[in-house]
């Protein structure tokens, strides 16, 4: 097992759990919870025990079928957060060089700090729509790079990396002997656009994902890792340190959810399509924000043209009962993240209050 640093904490997750709640929550990035009553679940379908030593086989079969891979390439985890922790713990040793995008999801950096990795960064620039720039990416790779980390869709901007670009990034990483870990949890929201997991693009790809963000099934905690069988065996050994056995009722619920995923997907698609119109109309009305229209995902990441967001976010929550994620958690203090994946009335009301707060906001003079 790799050595771990005991003082690494995720300031973002602490904030999200303790300070993000508000009457109008635009901080969340996962689709509104799917009602359990709308799944054909009966109490007699559930059991306390019955899981296998390394995955409940009916669930493992569904995960493998969904991903189009053999079961030997799948690790079951309790959500994407655990998937990322397990994957990174298995892939990275203390002192290994890891190349990761900026901005990125804060807990990924925290895990790397926890492990003691040597972290290098490459920029995904706001003025270029946070697209993955292959030139910048290739320049930052070195002969010592052991792992590259990408989010697709990008968190926080929801920018999509197309298959050609992802394949080229994988080829560049392969030339220096590096693997590529891709967090694909938000890619599940590309309901209308065909896509393949990056796992199918090259032997050096490892992928994490879950049902938590795109489907409103966060409470089931169904996540997974896709990796080559040799890596999968190592990752299961990391899982052994996290629990003796998973929550079997959650595994059974996940099987039921997979068997009715079309129904769950249709509800999520309709919600996001409606809310995306609202957020894009909001962005058009606000030239004081710099942000491309939303095309994918559950979030946008606008930049305040004047002022920093820390004070604005505080005023928004305290005076307008609305929460967004401060850009400081993504190392972008002029930005903030808006989630538009809640109930439509909540999103509409939150955007109205966000408009009012922007009109009232007077950034402090220098």
Predicted regions and their residues:
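N-terminal small-domain helix-loop-helix segment of the aminotransferase-like
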Residues: 2-82, 86, 361-366
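PLP-dependent aminotransferase-like
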Residues: 6, 90-150
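A short helix->loop->beta-strand "cap" motif at the edges of active sites that frequently abuts
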Residues: 96, 117, 175-179, 203
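Helix C-cap/helix->beta junction micro-motif
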Residues: 115, 175-176, 286, 320, ...
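Active-site phosphate-binding strand-loop segment of PLP-dependent enzymes
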Residues: 126-193
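Conserved core segment of the aminotransferase class I/II
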Residues: 201-273, 280, 352, 363
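Conserved glycine-rich beta-strand-loop-beta hairpin in the small C-terminal domain of fold type I
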Residues: 255, 271-280, 290-303
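PLP-dependent enzyme catalytic core of the Aspartate aminotransferase-like
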Residues: 315-324, 330-366
């Amino acid at each position: 097992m790799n050595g771990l640093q005991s003082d690494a904490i995720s300031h973002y997750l602490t904030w999200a759990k303790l300070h993000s709640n508000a009457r109008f929550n635009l901080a969340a990035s996962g689709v509104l919870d799917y009602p359990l009553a709308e799944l054909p679940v009966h109490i007699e379908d559930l059991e306390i025990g019955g899981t296998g030593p390394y995955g409940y086989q009916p669930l493992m079969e569904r995960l493998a079928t969904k991903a189009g891979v053999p079961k030997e390439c799948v690790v079951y985890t309790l959500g994407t957060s655990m998937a990322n922790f397990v994957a990174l713990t298995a892939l990275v040793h203390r002192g290994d060089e890891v190349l990761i995008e900026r901005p990125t999801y804060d807990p990924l950096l925290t895990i790397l700090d926890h492990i003691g990795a040597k972290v290098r960064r490459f920029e995904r620039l706001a003025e270029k729509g946070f697209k993955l720039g292959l030139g910048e990416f290739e320049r930052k790779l070195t002969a010592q790079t052991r792992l590259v980390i990408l989010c697709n869709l990008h968190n926080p901007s929801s920018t999509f990396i197309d298959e050609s670009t992802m394949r080229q990034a994988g080829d560049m990483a392969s030339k220096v002997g590096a693997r590529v870990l891709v967090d694909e949890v938000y890619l599940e929201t590309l309901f209308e656009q065909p896509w393949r997991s990056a796992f199918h693009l090259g032997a050096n790809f490892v992928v994490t994902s879950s049902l938590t963000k795109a489907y409103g099934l966060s409470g089931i905690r169904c996540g997974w890792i896709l990796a080559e069988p040799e890596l999968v065996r190592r990752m299961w050994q990391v899982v052994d340190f996290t629990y003796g056995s998973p929550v079997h009722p959650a595994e059974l619920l996940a099987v039921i959810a997979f068997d009715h995923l079309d129904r769950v997907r249709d509800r999520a698609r309709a919600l996001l399509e409606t809310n995306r119109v609202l957020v894009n109309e909001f962005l058009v009305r606000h030239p004081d924000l710099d942000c491309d229209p939303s095309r994918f995902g559950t979030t946008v990441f606008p930049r305040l043209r004047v002022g920093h967001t820390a004070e604005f976010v505080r005023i928004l929550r305290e005076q307008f009962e609305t929460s967004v994620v401060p850009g400081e958690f993504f190392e972008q203090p002029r930005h903030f993240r808006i989630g538009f994946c809640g109930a439509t009335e909540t999103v509409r009301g939150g955007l109205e209050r966000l408009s009012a707060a922007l009109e009232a906001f007077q950034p402090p003079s220098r």
